[in-house]
Amino acid sequence: MRVLEVNESKGEVKVRVEDEEDVWILHSALRPGDLVRARTARSVAGSSGKEKIPMTLTIKVTGSEFQAFSNVLRVKGVVVEGPDKFGLIGSHHAIKVYPGKEITIIRERGLAQLLERLKKGEERKPQVPVLAVDYDEYSLAVVRGQGIEWVFEGSLRLPGKGDEGREAATERKINELAKRVSEELKLRNLDHVVVVGPGFLKDKVAQRLSEEGFKVKVDSASSGGRAGVLEAIRKGSLRGVAKELESIKALEALEEFVKHVARGDGYALYGVDDCMTAAQANAVKTLIISDDLLHSPDLGERAVELVELAEKKGAEVIIVPKGTEAWERLRPFGDVVCLLRFPISL
């Protein structure tokens, strides 16, 4: 993300989107009621029927559509400014945002919080590939700011332990898996990988990848597959490789939340109302909230107020994208939970 211009007196910030992580950051930063100005194409009636005309429009945001790990965001809203001759004021329009696109966001209140969120996009965005492998299954994932992207998974399908061809088959399967991982990493311009699993199989795969020139970190996990990847994140295998990935922080915070709920010690709350009460009491240490709650037609406005208040009070706010592992864990608790500095009475 490149912040191109800031006009604090008008509440305006102009940015250029540089990659798909920026698309996600914009989705999480935009609020209903924001104004978004950009070049776009609009179908208008002409002498020979409807045709798409490029133009600059400003819309008042009503919502946005984003699919995790995609590179296109559709910002939906009502046109408030545009060429007079087309009579578009008051009509609905969606502006597509993608890498390379420049847009201007206008926010009357809370520009500082918006800028803070957007400037996260100017920081380096690490991507950490994790391979979890055992004798039954394997899974390659890429852990990014917006969540865990599951790249591929499968089973090694090795012969039984008493089969005389097991050793040769194991070597062949290891080479095939290492080659597939190598191709995927090169495709994504990644030069590092974390390999986890039980026993010696992970070490053999790691050795092959190291011979391919990758920087490899090896750690133990009780299983391969998705469970092994998630275990690696929980136990901190990615620390030192990616310190500030928001997706990792979300999963770690949710683990802590569940522990406090199980203990009943009063250091964890969930739901918009209880989290709001805690924020008003300056008790919130960490707020974890789903982005679809922020864009909800029913609770979105109150959810935005909660985020703004928590940030104002100095709490860490983690926004979780729809469809990710953290989002699945957040859903049963009303899409928002918080960790407290101290217990409060409700």
Curated annotation (Swiss-Prot):
Physiological role: May function in recognizing stalled ribosomes, interact with stem-loop structures in stalled mRNA molecules, and effect endonucleolytic cleavage of the mRNA. May play a role in the release non-functional ribosomes and degradation of damaged mRNAs. Has endoribonuclease activity.
Location in or out of the cell: Cytoplasm
Organism listed in the record: Ignicoccus hospitalis (strain KIN4/I / DSM 18386 / JCM 14125)
InterPro entries: eFR1_2_sf, eRF1_1_Pelota, eRF1_3, Pelota/DOM34_N, Pelota_arc, Ribosomal_eL30-like_sf, Transl-rel_pelota
Subunit text: Monomer.
EC number, as in UniProt: 3.1.-.-
Protein name in the entry: Protein pelota homolog
Predominant cellular place of this UniProt entry's protein: cytoplasm
GO biological process: nonfunctional rRNA decay; nuclear-transcribed mRNA catabolic process, no-go decay; nuclear-transcribed mRNA catabolic process, non-stop decay; ribosome disassembly; RNA surveillance
Keyword Metal-binding: yes
Family statement drawn from the similarity comment of this UniProt entry: Belongs to the eukaryotic release factor 1 family. Pelota subfamily.
